């Protein structure tokens, strides 16, 4: 009996490794390979501080990420080898409150 070898088609799954900044709160660096910062600019690494491993995340089959746009992350990883996630802008609660109070006052004056 003759054996037939069927070549396997290997699809390259896309993973990313996420590191937390030791210098900046809520700042994360996504790279393609664990401990490989070779494509990350030196100035960015200096400002980021010592990377602290947060998680390894498969990107294939995923529909969204919590605090980043999935397609932007994938594109940045392919094109530049990293993605930097910055913290969301701080909420200006006083401005929101004054805006709400102003709206309520204008409705009361009618």
UniProtKB/Swiss-Prot annotation:
Domain YcgL: 14-98
Membrane-spanning residues: none
Signal peptide span: none
Domain of life: Bacteria
UniProt cross-references to InterPro entries, sorted A to Z: YcgL-like_sf, YcgL_dom
Record-given protein name: Protein YcgL
Taxonomic source organism: Salmonella arizonae (strain ATCC BAA-731 / CDC346-86 / RSK2980)
Lineage of the species this protein comes from: Bacteria, Pseudomonadati, Pseudomonadota, Gammaproteobacteria, Enterobacterales
